[in-house]
Every structure is written in C-alpha cells, then in structure tokens.
C-alpha cells in the first residue's frame, strides 16, 4: 500500500514518539534488462516463479545520533555466494531502555549470518523463535533487539521482521511498507475497531509505541512471508531502524531512495 500523500490510496501512519539511532541499509535492485510485457494469462507476479537477478547494488549507512552508545547492528552475507546461496541482509536495533540491547543486536546479526544459507525459508520463523528463547534465558527479559532479515534468491524476496524496524519497497516512485510494526498501538487499534473504545484513544495511549514483540521475548511472534514476493527491475529495498523512519518523513525517505 502506498505510503505517501500523493498516492491514490490514503492510509494513516502514527509515528513513534521518540527517534532512535539512525541506521539504514539500502538494497538497490537495478536490473539491466528491459521489462517484458506481461501476457494476459501470466501468473500473478507475487507467486510466479522468479527469474534471475542480473545486477544487485548494495549500500549502508549508520550513525550514532545523540546517543552515547551505538546499539544498532547490521550485516550482509558474502556477495560472492549470491548465485549459489542468495543474499541475506540483516538489521537489528538494540532496545535502548535495556542494558544489553547493543550486545544482543550484534549477536543476533551474527547468529542469522551463521545460519545462512538455510534449506527452507519457511523454517526461519522457528529458528528466530529458538534464538529469542535462548536470549530470554540468558538475560531474563533485561535485553532485546528488533530484527529485519531479508533474503534475495533471484528476483524472489523472503523476509522476517520483529519489533518496530521497517522494510520499505520503492517501486515506480511509490513507497510501500512490506512489514507491520509490532507495537502496542496496532493491538489497541484492532481492539478499538471492535468497539472497545474510540480509535483516538488507541493513537494517544502513553504506551502506544511500546514493542509487543522483540528478540529476547520468551514467546515470540514473527512477521514473515509465507510466499516469496517477486521483485521487479529497478525496485529498491530499505531496511531501516526507527531512528530513520521516525526522524524522516515518508516523502523524505522516498526521495532519498
């Protein structure tokens, strides 16, 4: 769904109250071959078998911001293994209110890279849950991190997200959010839509920006793809912590991409 005001579809987005550290990892997919016209009987692009990925551009940016400690971490699997294994890009944002946020973020990135390549993308949510359980047992809820993990195989994209970090897609000049932030605000909105209380109360609740899911939680729920998402020529992906997406407007993010 387009996330900028000039799109034909309008949706609301409530920004978090505080901006965290700035970290963005941009995956720019610049395919050199021209697009072919789709035949009338061609399968839906989301489920169609993806073709090869001729050209892939990568870039990353990390900043400390106003914090004294960098609690964000990111990593990319070896590009030399792109054709054999695909590519994994991981971003973690350590939870600033927890003592071990930075450490857990770094260890989570390392863990994901050590597990890749995995045999079955559908098994990744369970791998993440197992890791989160280990983190919980070690830190007893006193440390945590968000997670965005994107896997590219040819033109197929799989992803798993935990917490309030973002995965954006820029396509034909429009910005789309591919994941849903796991914040208390979204749970409140669903309850408000059921008639429990006004939607305005959900958006102004003092705990609206609190995370409902994070690595380090005992019983974790991931936001993951079940079917691969097919990328198109000139698509661009952005893995971003809330330090970027809560500081910049969606139009600024789109223009920067």
Task: Give the label of every model feature segment.
Residues 2-257:
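PP2C/PPM-type serine/threonine phosphatase catalytic domain
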């Amino acid at each position: 769904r387009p996330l900028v005001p000039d799109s034909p579809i309008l949706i609301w987005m409530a920004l978090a109250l505080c901006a965290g550290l700035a970290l963005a990892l941009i995956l720019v997919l610049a395919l050199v071959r021209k697009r072919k016209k789709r035949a009338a009987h061609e399968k839906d692009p989301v489920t169609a078998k993806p073709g090869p990925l001729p050209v892939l551009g990568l870039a990353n940016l990390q900043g400390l911001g106003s914090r004294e400690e960098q609690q964000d971490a990111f990593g990319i699997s070896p590009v030399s293994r792109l054709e054999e294994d695909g590519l994994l890009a991981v971003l973690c944002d350590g939870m600033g209110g927890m003592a071990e946020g930075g450490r857990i973020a770094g260890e989570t990135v390392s863990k994901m890279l050590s597990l890749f390549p995995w045999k079955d993308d559908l098994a990744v949510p369970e791998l993440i849950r197992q890791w989160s359980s280990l983190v919980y047992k070690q830190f007893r809820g006193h440390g945590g991190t968000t997670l965005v993990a994107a896997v590219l195989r040819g033109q197929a994209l799989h992803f798993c997200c935990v917490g309030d970090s973002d995965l954006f897609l820029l396509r034909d000049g429009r910005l789309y959010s591919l994941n849903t932030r796991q914040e208390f605000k979204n749970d409140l909105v669903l309850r408000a839509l059921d008639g429990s209380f006004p939607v305005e109360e959900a958006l102004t609740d003092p705990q609206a920006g609190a995370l409902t899911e994070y690595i380090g939680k005992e019983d974790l729920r991931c936001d993951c793809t079940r079917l691969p998402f097919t990328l198109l020529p000139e698509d661009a992906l952005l893995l971003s912590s809330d330090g970027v997406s809560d500081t910049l407007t969606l139009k600024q993010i789109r223009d920067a991409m």
